[in-house]
Structure formats: structure tokens, C-alpha cells
Amino acid sequence: MAKIKRALISVSDKTGLVPFCQGLAEHGVSFLSTGGTARLLRESGLDVMDVSEFTGFPEMLDGRVKTLHPKVHGGLLGLRDNASHQQQMGEHGIEPIDMVVVNLYPFEATVAKEGCTLEEAIENIDIGGPSMLRSAAKNYRSVTVVTDPADYARVLESLRAHDGQCDAGLNAQLARKVYARTAAYDAAISNWLSALDNEGRPGAFPETYTVQFKKVQGMRYGENPHQSAAFYAESPPSEEASLATATQLQGKELSFNNIHDANGALELVKEFSKPAAVVVKHANPCGVAVHDGDLLAAYRMARDTDPVSAFGGIIALNRCVDVAVAKEIAQLFVEVIIAPEYDEQALELFATKKNLRLLRVPNIGVATAVSTMDLKRVTGGLLLQDRDLKQLPEGSLKVVTERAPSEAEMRDLLFAWKVVKHVKSNAIVYAKEQRTLGVGAGQMSRVDASRIAVWKAQDTAHTAGLRENPLLGAAMASDAFFPFRDGVDAAAKAGAKAVIQPGGSVRDEEVIAAANEHGMAMVFTGMRHFKH
């Protein structure tokens, strides 16, 4: 370790910069800087030398060339313990630079803005910043390099602990972080530019695609005990409500299957603005309900769709969990609970269940910037597609039967349509009064999915001691078109009175005729929701 005497500071994100540099100044560090960063430091009472004065070469080309100079990169790359390097530096008047604090032009944020032009994107490609970061990181044994404001406190703590020197282990960590950051930065530039056509217009998908994820946690094992696994988050992180942004408040470490299933529950509960509850088992919803103002009622209805399958499941809620809801949930063994918040009494009650995993995801239901790409790994390759985020445009439903749905039926059809989107194909959902009654998931034939959903609803009603048909007057949703009329016949036989489906089959007329024969209302969405 060597004492830090000179730092080069040039940042786009100035968060926490002034107190950090004031802390450096307390250790006798002098500053080199450029442009707006230099102005900020001077306005804060710090002495700063312009890089152009240090190099003896002016900034030029509208600021495109500031730090690309041998006196900068020689000062960063020269090995302090190499006599030849030191001799050459002396001969050319190159002085060592002991610290680099640089973060990059906001390319990712720029291209994320609607209407970003090629010229705007190009001007936000940083050249000097990555060059300095890479030079400093290559010589990390002698140079401390900081690219993330979150590391400022750690660096100052190390300087205080080591008399103005930065710990060698921390230097190595910071260097690794630099190469991860510059790799992600270059990937963002490459992905965006390679998606442009020859006229510079955004295309569909880039010719090459590079992604970066950051490790969140290791795991005991993967989907099965013989598989190794770890959980990674997008880098840079998304602001969207997700498992990657969740805070675990208690319980055992999340397993591979916990995270996979919890993601399905969270994505489904995000569909609803009213108080909603979702119960998921093996990534499929086994119960969903919405209630105008009562989360407890919504949870009870969701659980009671299929209480047998709910045992050991995942629960997602889109409102703060109070003690009344907590008491109801506590009657059932569950693996994970997801909610935006919990009141103190609820937390105290859940604390008695030490293994229960409790997750807080604050921005459930809040419109945020989202990652719009869906990645599916196949052996030897990657399938890349838009995420299935499209909502039904208002007025887009097409009534195709002689009878139109009533207002109540339409509410249930739209509810069931939101649910079926999150069920593995082939998928059928029966619903009534804003709650699921039966879910048929992952079947090779659509009619079998319908039969399973009917059986689940009838079995649950029978177990509960109910005599009436639970599906009488229900709405039925299908994630894809009916290839034959048998699915509609099965729904009518079960008691359903309304159907929502994409349409588009060569036998649509036959299917519509079946619905008319049974006095059912049917609407087409023109949109399919396969899920594999």
C-alpha cells in the first residue's frame, strides 16, 4: 500500500461527491478534475488543478478530448516498484496519480428515454472515463479506483484505518467492480447500436446481445438437490417491483424454487389495482381473488379456491398486511409471503414462525420503468422476446355470440383473463364474483384443462359441504383459442355462462355456434397468452 497523494475526479453522478472529497482532503490528497466536477469542488472550497494544466494540453473537440493524454495514463499505469517505469516517467515529467474517481456518461439512461436520437446516444458514449477506469484498475496494487458512489464511505474508512492508504483487498475489490461496470457499459452501447437499421432507426432485436447480472445470493442447491444454483439480479438494477428488489424480513434463506414460485405470484398480483391475493404452487396460481376494500376477504377467497394445493404455497398480496390478515394466513403452512408492507402486530405474529420467509416489496402496483425483455435459455442458445405485458385496450373486446355478457359477467371475464395469462398452457380458469373457482394448468389438450378446472371447483365445493353447483353462472377464460367446440361444451355442462378467449381458430364459427346453443356469451380478445 502507498499513501494516496493525488486523485483525479471526473463524474457524471455527483451524489455524495463533495463530502467524499472533503474526507480525502483531510488526508492531504490533492485534486485533478475537469469541467463541471472541477467547478463543484471549487465551489465547495476545495483546491483543484484542471487536468489541462496538469497535462499542458488543452481540452479540445468540444470536450471529447480531456484526459486522453500520456501524463494521465502514464501516471495511472506506471508501476511504482518498477525502476524502469519510474525512470521513464521521470524523463517525461509524468507524475503518479494514486486515485481515480470516475463514473460514466449516462448512456443507459439516455437511450431509455422515449424519442432518444442517434446523435444524443452517441454524445453520451463515454471514451475518456472507461479508459481511465481500465488503466487504474489494471494497476490496482498502486491505484485506488472508485466508480460507484456507494463505495465512498468504505474508501474513507480504509484511509482512516491505514493512515491515508487504501487497503490492498479493497483496492482489488474496487478494480473487479470497474471491469464489471465497463463490461456492462460497453454491452449497453453494443446492444443499442446493433439494434439500429442502416438509417439509424431502432430495430427489433440486436445482431449481438450481451447481458450482465450481479450475484445476489448463493443457494444450497437448485431446482433439485443434485443441482448447484445461485440467484442473480439485473445490472444495473431495475426499479420494477421484483424479487431482486425485495427485502427479506425473516425466515430461512430463499431457495431456488421459492424464488421461481414467488416471482410468479408477484407478477400476477401486480395485475390488480384493487386489494388482491394470490396463492401459487409450483409456479401456477391455485387461487386468486380481488375485493373492493377488504384484503382479508380477498385472501380467504383466494385460499379457498383450492385449500389443499394452498398448503406449502406462496402468498402474494398488494396491500399492507395487518394483524387480522396475518392471523388468517398463520392458520395455514406457507413457504413465502410477499406484500408491500406489514404492520407491527403482523410482524410480531409472523415472528413466532421462524421458518416463514417474509418479503417486503414496497412498490407493488406502482407504475415504474420495467425491463421489457424476456430471456429463455435453450441448450446452445437463448430465446429473446418482449415480456407479455400488453393489456387489453379499452373497447377492444369483440362480442361474437347472440347474447352479450352482463356487466357482472364482463367483470368476471376480465378478471379471469388476467389470471389465465399467468397459468401454464394449456390453461383454463373459471371465475365468479372476482375470485377463481377452478384452475386447469399445463395440459396437452385444452378440453382436459377445462375438465381439471371443473373437477377442482366441484371437489373443493364438495369437501366444504356445499350442495349447489359452484360453477353455475361462472365465467371461463382460455389462454388460447378453442380448436374444437368440446371445450365450450364442457364449460356449459359445468354451468358456465360466459367465455373469454382469443379467437382465431379455423373452427371459430363452430365454437361460436356451440356457445349460442348453450345460451352463453362469448368475447374474443384477439390476443393469446401462451405461457411455457
Swiss-Prot record:
Pathway: Purine metabolism; IMP biosynthesis via de novo pathway; 5-formamido-1-(5-phospho-D-ribosyl)imidazole-4-carboxamide from 5-amino-1-(5-phospho-D-ribosyl)imidazole-4-carboxamide (10-formyl THF route): step 1/1; Purine metabolism; IMP biosynthesis via de novo pathway; IMP from 5-formamido-1-(5-phospho-D-ribosyl)imidazole-4-carboxamide: step 1/1. Its EC number is 2.1.2.3, 3.5.4.10. It catalyses: (6R)-10-formyltetrahydrofolate + 5-amino-1-(5-phospho-beta-D-ribosyl)imidazole-4-carboxamide = 5-formamido-1-(5-phospho-D-ribosyl)imidazole-4-carboxamide + (6S)-5,6,7,8-tetrahydrofolate; IMP + H2O = 5-formamido-1-(5-phospho-D-ribosyl)imidazole-4-carboxamide. GO terms for molecular function: IMP cyclohydrolase activity; phosphoribosylaminoimidazolecarboxamide formyltransferase activity. InterPro entries: AICAR_Tfase_dup_dom_sf (IPR024051), Cytidine_deaminase-like (IPR016193), MGS-like_dom (IPR011607), MGS-like_dom_sf (IPR036914), PurH-like (IPR002695). Pfam families: AICARFT_IMPCHas, MGS. SUPFAM superfamilies: Cytidine deaminase-like, Methylglyoxal synthase-like. CDD domains: IMPCH. SMART domains: AICARFT_IMPCHas, MGS. The keyword GTP-binding does not apply. GO terms for biological process: 'de novo' IMP biosynthetic process. Residues 1-147 form the MGS-like domain. It comes from the Bacteria. Disulfide bonds: none annotated. Keywords: Hydrolase, Multifunctional enzyme, Purine biosynthesis, Transferase. GO terms for cellular component: cytosol. Belongs to the PurH family. The IMP cyclohydrolase activity resides in the N-terminal region. HAMAP family: PurH (MF_00139). This is Bifunctional purine biosynthesis protein PurH. The lineage of its organism: Bacteria, Pseudomonadati, Pseudomonadota, Alphaproteobacteria, Magnetococcales. The gene is purH.
